[in-house]
Amino acid sequence: EIVRLEKEEIPAILTAAETGDGLGGRQESFHKHTKIRDSAIIALFLGTGIRNSELVGLNTDDVDFSNNSFVVTRKGGNRVILYFNDEVGGFLRDYYEQRLANKAASPDDKALFLSLQNSRITTRAVQNIVKKYSGVAAPLKKITPHKLRSTFGTQLYRNTGDIYVVADVLGHKDVNTTKKHYAAITDDIRRKAAVEISITDSEKNK
């Protein structure tokens, strides 16, 4: 079974990143310095299905707000365009503007996401960010960046019913990998499809 966030937990983890509610001690004191960055990271995972390694590899010039897109380097070195909606774009733009205004960062460092030491953020640091806020939103689940990716994949599959689209967006080379991961949702998709089919004049029956 896929471990993922449920619908009500998705806004909860974003709220935790934005507000810091539920954090304690050092986490709470650092939150004001990291909340814009952390919110953008959580939003990107939930809204695009990006991999942790792809996220930390992003550079400032990989983002194109005019097309709501960014370029990631996939396994094997392939460069692929991913798209985000306006909601995700809002979080990303807020951080992007903060990042460009950061005078402490080296002008030669093109990394999009920076640590508090103003160097490219690490995958371990991103794991800890996700762990921190998911501990508030879903304390009984062990949520990782990959689980947020699974959450996105689940949402996309439920919305499209198209396993091939999900495989393509997630960057799975073999669609059978995707089918295996999301097999449990297939029955729900079929059930929803059956409900959508009308065999009479629905307008007349209203």
Describe every region a protein language model picked out:
Residues 1-206:
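Conserved catalytic core of the tyrosine transesterase superfamily
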